[in-house]
């Protein structure tokens, strides 16, 4: 069958279209001043002004008044028939060259002697009549994008329908537009109707032109709007108000299209046009006192303002409630408008840009129930380490948190922080299925810091990160997540079931539940092209590293591993790519099946589809991460506060616990209840409070009921260094709280339970450092001590030994027992062991020191205190220590009173001299025995 190609032949009719197209294209070149629309409009005005009559002499309705544009059908038909008859007599035809998507056929020149063409041009082509037929064409450039049906010239059907777009003059009603366009012209000398029509068109054009975007006069616009939207009683003073034309107004469930928005000193008034074909025009008014806040979004490129005004409304019961009034206004010069509005009343600048996150209460009712969370970090910010104790922990500083502000790029610290957070949310039994790389892995893999062009070299890329995965079973994981930061953009790589590549063939993979593949999730699709080869090569090299004998078949499978670029929700701005990465990852962890296959992704669940989630949901992650960091800060503050409270509180007495405190005698033997110490250069001593019961277990007792302190000292070790050597081993026991320091200088430590500070000294050191302060009074700590059970009767050899040691020095050592002699046996069998105090003190202290006796409120419990002083020249370790032993009873006193009263030990001893059983004489008595 022969095809007909005549439709492709070039005809003479096409020449007209080509010529019309050429003329249209000429208008897009440098404009000629003689053909400007302004000059054409001036020609029309001059033509009409010559034959214009006074408006008072006109009869019939005026087309220039839109309020009276809607007339009865009888008058309209009568006017139309009269005008058509006159047009036939004058053989004048009004042709409107209306351009639509189709080309208009040329008007038959034989039937037209004079033609007036009003061309409402758009982007399509219009054919003009041949000027050889002496047609006088007059064109109005009234650029419209809508379609108008052309008049049937042959049958003289004068029916038009016009729908004017946004770029043409405004016409609220179809009747007004139809009345304006359905009026043909007669000859200029035939009748007054032509003059009326031209006058009406001219007035209408001048009125409507003020509302178009090309209008140069703002005052004309306001005059026109106030004239057609308000009656005489509602006229407003333009000098004290700001008027704007809205695209739409929304208040609760009420919607209104074109209307006026008036800001005045009294408030805000909204009124729709009178000709909106509504029974009751939309109107509302709010006083200045009813305005709660005003916020706006200015889209400067299109000149659109979205106003969100929160106002107070009263219901039928006169209860106030807050509603949002949303207004869209087209305004290119918004800053000037805003300045004028603020000058109307002092309330406007006060409520402008009010933070809507603050709760607003009206009559005791919280109007903002759904308060969005935006934490403030104005206070000093302490770095957050998360997760604490993890080798991959992330440290977040204040600068990182500031990047969570709107319209800001998030950095790698925020990305890694939230990935660690998601990783910790996974169940413990499920963690082995996932592996998460941090944001630095891809940077190291692609070597972006040195040579970004090497991103295609997979072998070299693997060698750079080989240590990262040496201890990770990469091919035993179900999912491996790789955050990608490349070319200032974030995306996510998910490697699914990589171990299945070597275990299954391509034929098996189609029917397999686990299909190995690489998923690329990109919020700006196409921006990270070129990652396919890098990831495939890396996996191949990783497999070869773990399997030395790898066949070429398996290598080819890795190199041909499926790389799927998913169609996912896309970001709507240029700075939320990192948030989309995190949201992709979070939703994938929540919805990913145990066995994944890209061939079995169903649209029913929206999983990994374009409608997976709304884009705004990912953008809101800024607030979520801010809240999460703020909660971590609060938890850390509570922990620190609890530690401080525990350090200030007295610990609970436990029978097996003791405190240890090693002090320098250089800081003096005088210690008050607040931990302050007075220094003396001559007298030195050591005060020790035992920590653990196990610390004294190595001490051997002289008999079954007690302990002898001479076992602490060797015959050849009489200095303080050897004493510390004896005590060092029990301190290093794991059960003790602190160990002695091996540093050259003393180190201060704090007991976390009691809050006290301790000084640990090296063994053998004679120069002790003083503790400047203690966090809590030493005497306030009530420790349960070990019942030493010191015997009341001393053996002869022990007495001799003690006498010998007392002769070698002027120092004296006293052991004072709190228990009376008659109650000794009763206390030994008591269930609660008594608390005792052992004092080793220097005789050289004399009256320069005030040794205190500690008393407890409990009658059965006593306190043990060891004071080991040295001689004045204890810096010289070769000088021996001379001790004397004194054993006696004492009663307990309140520690607080002891600190305040500071009674010396000598007065206590004199009062209780009769009650003390002397097992060894004091210093003076020892000297008499020697004599």
Curated annotation (Swiss-Prot):
Residue ranges with Polar residues bias: 839-851
Nuclease as UniProt keyword: no
Region called Disordered, residue ranges: 204-224, 825-931
Keyword Oxidoreductase: no
Listed GO biological process terms: protein desumoylation; proteolysis
Active site: 489, 522, 577
Segments of skewed composition (Basic and acidic residues): 873-904
Top-level taxonomic group: Eukaryota
Role this protein plays: Protease that catalyzes two essential functions in the SUMO pathway: processing of full-length SUMOs to their mature forms and deconjugation of SUMO from targeted proteins.
Name the UniProt record assigns to this protein: Probable ubiquitin-like-specific protease 2B
Gene name of the record: ULP2B
């Amino acid at each position: 069958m022969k095809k007909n190609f005549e439709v492709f032949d070039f005809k003479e009719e096409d020449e007209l279209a080509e010529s019309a197209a050429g003329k249209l294209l000429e208008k897009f070149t440098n404009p000629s001043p003689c053909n400007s629309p302004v000059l054409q409009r001036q020609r029309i005005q001059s033509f009409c002004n010559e034959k214009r009559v006074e408006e008072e002499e006109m009869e019939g309705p005026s087309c220039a008044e839109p309020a009276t544009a809607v007339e009865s059908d009888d008058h309209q038909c009568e006017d139309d028939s009269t005008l058509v008859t006159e047009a036939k007599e004058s053989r004048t035809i009004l042709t409107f060259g209306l351009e639509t998507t189709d080309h208009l056929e040329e008007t038959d020149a034989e039937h037209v002697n004079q033609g007036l063409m009003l061309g409402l041009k758009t982007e399509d082509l219009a054919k003009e009549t041949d000027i050889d037929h002496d047609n006088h064409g007059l064109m109005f450039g009234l650029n419209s994008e809508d379609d108008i049906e052309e008049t049937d010239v042959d049958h003289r059907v004068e029916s038009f329908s016009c729908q004017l777009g946004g770029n043409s003059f405004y016409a609220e009603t179809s009747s007004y537009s139809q009345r304006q366009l359905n009026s043909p012209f007669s000859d200029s000398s035939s009748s007054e109707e032509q003059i009326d029509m031209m006058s009406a068109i001219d007035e209408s054009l001048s009125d409507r032109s003020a509302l178009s975007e090309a209008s140069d006069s703002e005052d004309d616009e306001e005059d026109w709007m106030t004239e057609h939207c308000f009656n005489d009683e509602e006229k407003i003073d333009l000098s004290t108000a700001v008027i704007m034309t809205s695209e739409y107004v929304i208040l609760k469930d009420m919607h209104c299209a074109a209307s006026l928005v008036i800001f005045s000193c009294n408030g805000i008034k909204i009124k729709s046009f009178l000709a909106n074909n509504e029974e009751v025009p939309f109107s509302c008014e709010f006083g200045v006192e009813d305005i709660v806040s005003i916020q706006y979004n200015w889209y400067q490129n299109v000149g659109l303002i979205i106003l969100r005004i929160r106002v107070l409304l009263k219901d039928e019961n006169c209860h106030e409630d807050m509603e949002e009034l949303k207004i869209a206004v087209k305004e290119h010069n918004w800053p000037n408008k805003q300045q004028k509005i603020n000058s109307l009343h002092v309330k406007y600048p006060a409520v402008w840009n009010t933070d809507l996150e603050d709760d607003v209460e009206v009559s005791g009712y919280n109007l903002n129930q759904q308060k969005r969370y935006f934490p403030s970090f104005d206070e000093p910010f302490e770095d957050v380490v998360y997760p604490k104790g993890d080798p991959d922990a992330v440290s977040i500083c204040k600068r990182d948190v500031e990047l969570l502000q709107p319209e800001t790029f998030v950095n790698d610290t925020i990305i890694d922080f939230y990935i660690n957070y998601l990783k910790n949310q996974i169940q413990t039994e499920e963690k082995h299925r996932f592996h998460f790389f941090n944001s630095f892995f891809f940077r190291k893999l692609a070597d972006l810091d040195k040579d970004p062009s090497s991103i295609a070299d997979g072998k070299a890329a693997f060698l750079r990160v080989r240590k990262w995965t040496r201890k990770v079973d990469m091919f035993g994981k179900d999912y491996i997540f790789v955050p990608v930061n490349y070319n200032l953009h974030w995306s996510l790589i998910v490697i699914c079931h990589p171990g299945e590549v070597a275990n299954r063939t391509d034929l098996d993979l189609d029917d397999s539940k686990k299909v190995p593949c690489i998923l690329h999730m990109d919020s700006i699709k196409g921006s990270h092209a070129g990652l396919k080869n890098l990831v495939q090569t890396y996996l191949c090299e990783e497999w070869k590293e773990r399997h030395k004998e790898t066949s070429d078949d398996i290598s080819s499978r890795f190199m041909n591993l499926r790389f799927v670029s998913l169609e996912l929700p896309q970001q709507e701005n240029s700075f939320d790519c990192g948030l989309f990465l995190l949201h992709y990852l979070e939703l994938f962890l929540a919805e990913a099946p145990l066995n994944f296959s890209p061939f079995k992704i169903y649209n029913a669940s929206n999983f990994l589809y374009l409608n997976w989630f709304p884009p705004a949901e990912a953008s809101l992650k800024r607030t979520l991460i801010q809240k999460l960091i703020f909660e971590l800060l609060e938890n850390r503050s509570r922990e620190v506060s609890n530690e401080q409270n525990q350090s200030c509180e007295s610990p609970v007495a436990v029978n097996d616990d003791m405190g240890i405190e090693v002090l320098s005698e250089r800081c003096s033997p005088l210690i008050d209840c607040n931990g302050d110490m007075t220094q003396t250069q001559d007298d030195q001593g050591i005060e020790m409070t035992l920590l653990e019961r196990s610390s004294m277990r190595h001490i051997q007792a002289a008999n079954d009921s007690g302990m002898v302190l001479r076992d602490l000292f060797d015959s050849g070790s009489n200095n303080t260094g050897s004493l510390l050597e004896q005590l060092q081993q029990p301190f290093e026991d794991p059960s003790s709280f602190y160990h002695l320091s091996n540093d050259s200088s003393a180190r201060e430590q704090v007991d976390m339970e009691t809050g006290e500070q301790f000084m640990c000294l090296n063994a053998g050191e004679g120069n002790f450092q003083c503790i400047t302060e203690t966090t809590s009074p030493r005497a306030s700590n009530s420790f349960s001590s070990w019942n030493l059970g010191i015997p009341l009767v001393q053996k002869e050899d022990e007495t001799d030994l003690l006498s010998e040691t007392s002769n070698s020095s002027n120092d004296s050592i006293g052991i004072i027992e709190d228990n009376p002699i008659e109650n000794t046996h009763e206390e030994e069998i008591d269930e609660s062991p008594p608390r005792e105090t052992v004092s080793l003190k220097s005789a050289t202290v004399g009256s320069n020191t005030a040794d205190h006796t500690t008393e407890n409120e409990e009658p059965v419990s006593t306190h043990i205190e060891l004071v080991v002083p040295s001689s004045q020249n204890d810096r010289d370790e070769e000088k021996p220590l001379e001790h004397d032993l004194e054993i006696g009873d004492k009663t307990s006193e309140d520690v607080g009173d002891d600190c305040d009263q500071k009674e010396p030990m000598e007065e206590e001893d004199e009062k209780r001299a009769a009650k003390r059983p002397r097992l060894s004489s004091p210093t003076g008595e020892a000297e008499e025995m020697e004599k």
